[in-house]
């Protein structure tokens, strides 16, 4: 019995030291408002309708720490088959800010771009549309944003 207790303790410690589950990472690193992703916009609509469409609370899916709203039952079912395809890059934070300086900056969900079947969201307030700046140096900013986002994710998996 004592051996079982020690084994369970070691398992818990190793999970804490060597990695976090996806739910914990999302809850601590993703751009969520009370657990809601993309301010309630439908992630599938960006791809299928090529526009930002507000989702409905009644068409929600909880996925590893984040709740997504959908504008239609069809979009909800599509998402459930493979959520990672439709989730925004960098946890839903501004792609430009992530690339420029590794900062988590809120977004305007209606300012977005899809590149290589990946959804990028951008800050667009106070006459500052960061999508325009992103487009001027997209390749470089994308590379840096990937590196910076990985630092956030890796900080969750190290003691």
Predicted regions and their residues:
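Bacterial Sec-dependent N-terminal signal peptides
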Residues: 1-22
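Charged, low-complexity intrinsically disordered segments
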Residues: 20-159
């Amino acid at each position: 019995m004592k051996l079982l207790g020690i084994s369970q303790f070691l398992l818990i410690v190793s999970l804490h030291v060597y990695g976090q589950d996806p739910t914990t990472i999302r809850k601590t690193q993703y751009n969520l408002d009370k657990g809601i992703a993309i301010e309630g916009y439908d992630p599938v609509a960006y791809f299928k309708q090529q526009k930002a469409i507000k989702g409905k609370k009644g068409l929600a899916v909880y996925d590893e720490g984040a709740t997504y709203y959908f504008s239609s039952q069809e979009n909800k079912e599509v998402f459930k088959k493979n959520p990672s395809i439709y989730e925004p890059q960098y946890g839903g934070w501004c792609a430009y800010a992530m690339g420029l300086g590794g900062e988590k900056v809120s977004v305007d969900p209606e300012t977005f771009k899809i590149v290589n079947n990946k959804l990028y969201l951008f800050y667009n307030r106070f006459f500052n549309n960061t999508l325009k700046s992103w487009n001027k140096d997209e390749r470089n900013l994308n590379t840096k944003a990937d590196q910076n986002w990985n630092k956030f994710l890796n900080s969750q998996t190290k003691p």
